[in-house]
Amino acid sequence: MSKKWYVVQAYSGFEKNVQRILEERIAREEMGDYFGQILVPVEKVVDIRNGRKTISERKSYPGYVLVEMEMTDDSWHLVKSTPRVSGFIGGRANRPTPISQREAEIILQQVQTGIEKPKPKVEFEVGQQVRVNEGPFADFNGVVEEVNYERNKLRVSVQIFGRETPVELEFSQVEKIN
């Protein structure tokens, strides 16, 4: 039998704990041959406060842990009896259904992309009022005209010398006005 990806439901907020405990139990029970990767899908997010950029992690699928495993009675029991695990998602209680290889690849790609390109924690919208906090237009207010999440840039209309002027700025150069 080959290893397949299964989705395990964990208590929300305890996903990393479940991952760690599962890895320890697999090693202790010498069941490494039945298990592959155990993932808590996260994405990095950029938060900008007072002009300072901080990068933190946000769970892509809160309450879920992905487990690559060969499903046997012993491997099923090891996962199911792990503290703070509610059970498997999909299929019947004693015979869960794995997610498709395509679904697994999409999730793994999202995880990789989230690590390489942090997403902004602050979501910007067209028409939103923002204040420029760094660069030549610092302390100017403007209106978001366009949002480009791939490049982490905004086109903001700023009033300069009485005229509306579009300016391209990085997410880190602006903050929302409440």
UniProtKB/Swiss-Prot annotation:
HAMAP family: NusG (MF_00948). Residues 126-156 form the KOW domain. It comes from Neisseria meningitidis serogroup B (strain ATCC BAA-335 / MC58). This is Transcription termination/antitermination protein NusG. Keywords: Transcription, Transcription antitermination, Transcription regulation, Transcription termination. SUPFAM superfamilies: N-utilization substance G protein NusG, N-terminal domain, Translation proteins SH3-like domain. Participates in transcription elongation, termination and antitermination. Pfam families: KOW, NusG. GO terms for biological process: DNA-templated transcription termination; regulation of DNA-templated transcription elongation; transcription antitermination; transcription elongation-coupled chromatin remodeling. InterPro entries: KOW, NGN, NGN-like_dom, NGN_dom_sf, NusG-like, Rib_uL2_dom2, Transcrpt_antiterm_NusG, Transcrpt_antiterm_NusG_bac_CS. Belongs to the NusG family. SMART domains: KOW, NGN. One of its GO terms (cellular component) is cytosol. CDD domains: KOW_NusG, NGN_Bact_1.
